[in-house]
Design a protein with these regions (language model features):
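HIT superfamily nucleotide-processing domains
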Residues: 1-170
Length: 170
């Protein structure tokens, strides 16, 4: 990712409309490949991944506080979706470790969103964790439309499978 692209992204995140709400409204330029929708939450491919298969999980409601914006029940419902989507992702994309974190800021990208990022096997330790998610050190992974469509289709198919039974692992 070039410095210009990062600067453009940061400007849009800080001064533009909510990207999640715009996506939900169908605003051109805010389209994402949705892989899960239960009516209250969505999961979709990250448009700017550093790792293959990186997803975002969001509540449909515009909530800005990742803890205080939820009741305990609504927070746990969102986390069930995070778990369900991450489990499906681990079945589709080979991973050594699944990163799950909430980013965003009161200064930009305010809509609560959880990042689910599969670290592939064999990445040296020094290139893991936050380094693996950093555009400035890792760059942005470029997928063709065909590759992104194929990945989204595989994830949708996995998410349509019956729920995991007790004790079954990813």
């Amino acid at each position: 990712v070039s410095d210009f692209e990062i600067a453009t992204y940061n400007e849009r995140a800080q001064t533009g409309p909510c990207f999640v709400c715009e996506m939900l409204a169908g605003t051109p330029g805010y389209e994402h490949r949705i892989v899960f929708d239960d009516g209250d939450h969505l999961a979709f491919l990250d448009k700017h991944p550093t790792l293959y298969g990186k997803l975002l999980v969001v509540p449909r409601s515009h909530i800005e506080d990742p803890i205080g914006g939820f009741t305990q029940d609504s927070y746990l419902a969102l986390q069930r979706v995070v778990h369900q989507v991450a489990t499906a992702l681990a079945r589709v994309v080979e991973t050594e470790r699944m990163y799950v974190l909430s980013l965003g800021s009161n200064q930009g990208n305010r809509h609560v969103h959880w990042h689910i990022a599969p670290l592939p096997p064999g990445v040296p330790y020094e290139e893991q964790q936050l380094y693996a998610l950093d555009w400035s050190t890792r760059g942005r992974l470029e997928l063709t439309d065909h590759e992104a469509d194929q990945l989204a289709a595989r994830l949708r198919a996995e998410l349509d499978r019956p729920a995991l039974t007790a004790g079954e692992s990813a």
